[in-house]
């Protein structure tokens, strides 16, 4: 099954149209996923049961599972996520505590991965020690931010305001981002779109070893 997190409004509208669903259904579904942040198909309460059953048969709700969350003394969190093929990737929450507001209300930067492993072989980086296994799909890239929102919503529920639960994204986790250009571009489109997380492009930083796609 393809991940729901890899669908754009246009592609999901087309998939639903094949089933005879009206165009507005796609926006409803994506609103449940990114704005209201439900954790299952059953949470999409304005959809019919037959439609929810079809969605469950057709799409993978979230193509990554949280294995462990490691928190360091400097309140940095590292999420270890398992993908459907058993591959493991890391996503890091970097907090910048601000005086007078406490850790839970501090600014948060999320470091996301774009590949399983890496082929670049930079001597200072552990990601490439085992070489490149494969590229992440757009859905797997976006899923990292969904897991972050789920964790951070429990601390400061920005989901009630339909806001992302972080302040900045840095694309400098596992992998060379520009070696997975097409999937990354699709993922960033989903993150930036008003029907997605609505996250501002000026708050996204991409780090590359110098590869030109």
Which residues are covered by each model-predicted region?
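Flexible, acidic/Gly-rich N-terminal and inter-domain linker regions that tether
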Residues: 1-108
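Conserved Radical SAM active-site core
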Residues: 94-213
């Amino acid at each position: 099954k393809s991940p729901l997190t890899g669908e754009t409004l246009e592609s999901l509208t087309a998939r639903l149209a094949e089933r005879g669903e009206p165009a507005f259904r796609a926006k409803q579904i994506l609103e449940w996923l990114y704005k209201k942040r439900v954790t299952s198909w059953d949470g999409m309460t304005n959809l019919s049961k037959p439609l929810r059953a079809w969605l469950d048969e057709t799409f993978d709700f979230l193509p990554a599972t949280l294995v462990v969350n490691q928190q360091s003394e400097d309140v940095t969190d590292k999420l270890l996520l398992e993908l459907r093929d058993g591959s493991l990737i890391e996503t890091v929450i970097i907090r910048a505590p601000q005086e007078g507001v406490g850790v839970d209300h501090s600014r948060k930067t999320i470091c996301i991965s774009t590949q399983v492993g890496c082929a670049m072989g930079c001597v200072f980086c552990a990601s490439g020690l085992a070489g490149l296994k494969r590229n992440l799909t757009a859905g797997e890239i976006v899923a990292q931010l969904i897991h972050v929102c789920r964790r951070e919503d429990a601390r400061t529920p920005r989901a009630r305001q339909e806001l992302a639960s972080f302040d900045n994204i840095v694309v400098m986790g596992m992998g060379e981002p520009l070696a997975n250009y097409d999937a990354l571009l699709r993922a960033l489109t989903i993150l930036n779109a008003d029907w997605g997380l609505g996250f501002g492009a000026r708050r996204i930083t991409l780090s590359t070893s110098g590869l030109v796609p």
